């Protein structure tokens, strides 16, 4: 609890004028789901009271809806490709003033120092960054990360560095089976939250996962999964990101049964969509369009995530809360016409106010993180196999981070070569295989964003030039110090440099978004790619904790059985 502020109390009593009076609006009261015609009196950063009173500044919103600001229930900053200050500049105009962030991408590259560097950079910004302690670094033993965290590191992040809980427990087999190390990481949360990650986990397995102390899940893809979780008291974060778009499949249960134990999250969001469509307000718009009443949408987008994550200063506009206020001339647009953060106007008309967000210097340890040793050649990335050979292939599912374990004949339509190159210690370790679902006809796509260990992942066409283009793409990433590239005919067609841990840019959000658009356009044009977000999909084919089949620097992994499998059948 924050210490009482005598100035706020004086304004609340009416003894002193408010610093700001927002009048003429309808204030949303989450507890009663009412719209109350009243004014908000703000003292400094805090809502001091409701009702008309003297104030140094008055803003008449002309009948607008006044709501708490949006909170993202679960996200990874690194997936936006933006450094922390640019992310805040991007989302404030859309009404988001708080996130629950799991920086396990940074942790996989740089360990605890990467996490604490992010915390320090975010602290001065006009934003609430709730940072969780990554629990599974590396995500599994099947891949080579740049760092490893055990229960002592997790505990230190919570107890010494202010992490607000333990982040998603991706090693759900370990938790369910009672692995002592995983249970020790869970226990490190103490009285704070322990987030989950349980794709496809149901029945007794889910019972065990919950009995261990896990409290939430954002991996539901089917309504039946979400219903079972809520029935058993588990929070469900309904995800609508760039690759995983699960809201349409899950929101009907909220329409039918109400919003209890549910909240909205983005998980992984690309910068182009972030600037174009919005952030949590985009999720809110989709939920409302699916039939969720506006009042319940606000619970999902504002109040519930704030309550779950312990953001007690956010989530409603009662006296004593932080004055993170959104004004909607038309609530149905879900685009706020004004955004106040801690009592200060930070955006109006969808545009950030000048000087609203200070620069956050980039720590030097985030640069120079791509270490390949000798750059692998075409033969190392794409071993020759005879046409007609039966092989396993990672089957990409558009708009999902799940994959299929495909068994195909080499040479079939819509196949691509695939490889993952270790990039943290220059070991030269390369895992090779095949992928389907990209529609790749020519060239190669490569990325140092490769969940969760973030090695170099590359796919190349099955034609004679594919291996050469794969080698060119990997070499270019080494030159850039990280990023994403499209190569065709031995030349770079487009690229997005990501020099910060190989995950994020140091450039303005609009520039990064434009580069991402150009990269996707090159992939769809010159290379023939048919899926909507090819680089987001590419980044997930190495994720060795979500079924079914994945490729890592150690080869193919069958996640259903948690074991390595050979390429050839």
Residue map of PLM features:
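Active-site microenvironment of metallo-dependent hydrolases
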Residues: 1-38, 42-43, 51, 92-94, ...
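Divalent-metal coordination cores built from histidine and acidic residues
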Residues: 2-11, 88-193, 257, 492-495
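Residue-level marker for buried hydrophobic side chains located in beta-strands
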Residues: 21, 69-71, 131, 264, ...
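Metal-associated gating/positioning segment near the N- to mid-region
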Residues: 53-56, 61-121, 464
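Active-site mouth loops of central-metabolism enzymes
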Residues: 72-83, 138-151, 215
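Active-site beta-loop-alpha junctions enriched in small/polar residues
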Residues: 76-78, 104-106, 134-139, 169-172, ...
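Short acidic, glycine/serine/threonine-rich loops at helix termini
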Residues: 110-114, 140-146, 177-181, 205-209, ...
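Histidine/acidic residue-rich metal-binding segments in metalloenzymes
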Residues: 148-167, 174-238, 244-264, 275-289, ...
